[in-house]
From Swiss-Prot:
Lineage: Bacteria, Bacillati, Actinomycetota, Actinomycetes, Mycobacteriales
CDD domains assigned to the protein according to its UniProt record, in alphabetical order: HATPase_Hsp90-like (cd16927)
Residue span of region C: 567-644
PANTHER family per UniProt: HEAT SHOCK PROTEIN 90 FAMILY MEMBER (PTHR11528)
Subunit structure: Homodimer.
Family: Belongs to the heat shock protein 90 family.
Subcellular location: Cytoplasm
Signal peptide range in chain numbering: none
Protein name stated in the entry: Chaperone protein HtpG
């Protein structure tokens, strides 16, 4: 008896998103079958694991499988599994996927990809957002889902035509597991809508996309036996056939697995639509035996910077699925790596808490990490185009490892690439920077900022450009943090151009005598400015890093920069920023004029106002925020009025 029937509407954003998918954002509509089979496989994995861990769960796991059923007359295709199943609440949550955070972003990106006729990008985005189930609507006018959770008596039926509404109801007498029935659209070769009731078509799709699935995929097929006697009729029978080989790819030698098989396996475990950038197959024997098949994606997922997102490494023990996102197997900064690890000497009853203390898991993690890093190193040296693709997509998170993985810090530094003043187009490694260092240069100079353009306009950079020193341009938020942890590379200290003392006078353009003379000439002004601007600065001194600007602000060698303080505050840590150092260009007309004005009329309020303007312009030039914008604007407006 049916009960609790509800007809609900997709939320506005979800309805628009579904509409985008229904109207051909998939270039390859065949992929819907891969998605449904992958979901069924996941459900079987979960049931086997739950049955092992929960001895009170009374279920039969002796014949777990996926069944494909075709009804040519009704033009329906059903994918059925006897896996874990779902409760009504879980079905509602599945539907809610479309309405969760990120929907607006996905919809916008899909629309842009569609407008640009970039179908591959559209597929990739849908895969990233984990809603491949809805690809069913590319080939079906209506989709029905019937499911019963293992151990529950009540089942749930969900139905939708993809036009803004769906129904959900509770039903009885349904088998355990989940079935998805597609009411297929008419064939349309121009729109790549094939006959998905064709036995040959279904068998070829399973072989192409899902041959490696660990569970048998069965379908009733037609068998024709030729007549044994002349004039007799052929015999037609129907029998159930297993369509897939069920061979675990990670257990097969790499030279026996085709590139296409690896691609399809990656798409299965990563729920991706693009091809992997690199495949890593490993086998370890000895103390800890395990096999691993890892993939470096070619595109970053939308949730790359969401630390709660799944890591993508599946853990098996002797080919038995244990968990789908084993974060203990890969450091957080490599969370984009997808794949499978199959350990041989571990309990099937392992939990996340046990894994955190497991010596074998820690050893496997170390080896996997080193293998991934060495693979990236090979990309860097042997396939520079692929390395550039990798670094563009994942470089920002790899640099997080400089803060946490001290064992591999040197390797990570070698892998990193940075923009620099050497080239507008090409990034540079630290090793390449060191090779280009000027004679007598002992430090690696860098600058941090929000954008390349902002840094290039910074007063701090002036003397470095004038004297031909290359400067690394670091624009990722994580750069502000790791440069405080990493002190050197290849024996060369890393030096911020905006922190501490920088000596660029080694080329002899400015004699020591001239420098000492300037110190005497500006001594009174420096002391007066330190007192006048005492609320803002701790020290005022002459600069050897300025050539065009009148002034700039410097942080102590070991001080916290304002940008770093902002990052800490954004993460909930209120870090106070100490007073900074104001450096003056002794050759700039504004500075020499201020010195003369101070000598002539030190008590004139306008001289103090000029000091405020000088400090404010230095703050603005580096992209900082004024403490009192109204006061600054008032003084500036008064000065401008006097010039007219």
């Amino acid at each position: 008896m049916n009960a609790r029937v509800e007809q609900l509407e997709f939320q506005a954003e979800a309805r628009q998103l579904l509409d985008l998918m229904v109207h051909s954002v998939y270039s390859n509509k065949d992929s819907f079958l891969r998605e449904l089979i992958s979901n069924a496989s996941d459900a079987l994995d979960k049931l086997r694991l739950e049955a092992f861990r929960n001895k009170d769960l009374d279920v039969d796991t002796s014949d777990l499988h996926i069944q494909i059923e075709v009804d040519k007359d009704a033009r329906t295709l059903t994918i059925r599994d006897n896996g874990i199943g779902m409760t009504r609440a879980e079905v509602v949550d599945l539907i809610g996927t479309l309405a969760k955070s990120g929907t607006a972003e996905l919809r916008q990106q899909l629309r842009e990809a569609k407008n640009a006729q970039n179908e591959a990008a559209s597929e990739e985005l849908i895969g990233q957002f984990g809603i491949g189930f809805y690809s069913s609507f590319m080939v079906a006018d209506k989709v029905e889902l019937l499911t019963r959770k293992a151990g529950e008596s009540e089942a749930t039926k969900w139905e939708s035509s993809g036009e803004g509404t769906y129904t959900i109801e509770s039903v009885e007498n349904a088998p355990q597991g989940t079935s998805v029935t597609l009411h297929l659209k008419p064939e349309d070769t121009e729109d790549e809508l094939h006959d998905y009731t064709s036995e040959f078509k279904i068998k070829s799709l399973v072989k192409k996309y899902s041959d490696f699935i660990a569970w048998p995929i069965r379908m009733e097929v037609e068998r024709r036996t030729p007549a044994t006697e002349e004039g007799g009729e052929e015999t037609v029978t129907r029998e159930v056939e297993t369509l897939n080989s069920m061979k675990a790819l990670w257990a097969r030698p790499k030279d026996e697995v085709s590139e296409e098989e690896y691609k399809e396996f990656y798409k299965h475990i990563a729920h991706a639509w693009d091809d992997p950038l690199e495949v890593i197959a490993m086998k370890a024997e000895g103390t800890f035996e395990y096999q691993a098949l890892l993939f470096i994606p070619s595109h970053a997922p939308f949730d790359l910077f969401n630390r709660d997102a799944h890591t993508g490494i599946q853990l098996y023990v002797k080919r038995v699925f244990i968990m789908g996102d084993c974060d203990q197997l890969m450091p957080e900064y490599l969370r984009f790596v997808k794949g499978v690890v199959d350990a041989q000497d571990m309990s099937l009853n392992v939990s996340r808490e046990i894994l955190q203390q497991d010596r074998q898991i820690k050893a496997i993690r170390r080896r996997l990490t080193k293998k991934v890093l060495s693979t990236i190193k090979e990309l860097q040296s042997e396939r520079p185009d692929d390395y550039r693709t990798f670094w563009t997509q994942f470089g920002r998170v790899v640099k997080e490892g400089l803060l946490s993985d001290f064992d591999n810090q040197e390797t990570l530094l070698q892998l990193c690439s940075f923009a620099s003043t050497h080239s507008e187009e090409e990034a540079t490694t630290l090793a390449q920077y060191v090779e280009r260092m000027k004679e007598g240069q002992t430090q690696i100079f860098y600058a941090t900022g929000e954008t390349r353009q902002q840094i290039l306009k910074s007063p701090h950079l002036e003397a470095f450009k004038a004297k031909g020193y290359e400067v690394l341009l670091l624009t990722d938020p994580v750069d502000e943090v790791w440069v405080g942890t990493v002190t050197e590379f290849d024996g060369k200290p890393l030096q911020s151009i905006a922190k501490g003392e920088v000596d660029l006078s080694a080329e002899g353009e400015e004699s020591q005598a001239e420098r000492e003379e300037q110190q005497k000439e500006f001594a009174d002004l420096l002391a007066w400015l330190k007192d006048t601007l005492s609320d803002h600065v701790k020290e005022v001194r002459l600069s050897n890093r300025l050539t065009d600007s009148p002034a700039c602000l410097i942080t102590d060698a070991f001080g916290i920069t304002p940008a770093l303080a902002r990052l800490y505050r954004a993460s909930g840590q209120d870090i106070p920023v100490g007073k900074r150092i104001l450096e003056l260009n002794p050759k700039h007309p504004l500075v020499t004029g201020l010195r003369q004005a101070h000598q002539d009329r030190a008590d004139d309020p306008s001289v103090a106002e000029t000091a405020e303007l000088l400090y404010g312009t230095a703050l603005l030039a580096e992209g900082g925020a004024l403490d009192d914008p109204a006061r600054f604007a008032e003084i500036l407006a008064d000065r401008l009025a006097r010039t007219l």
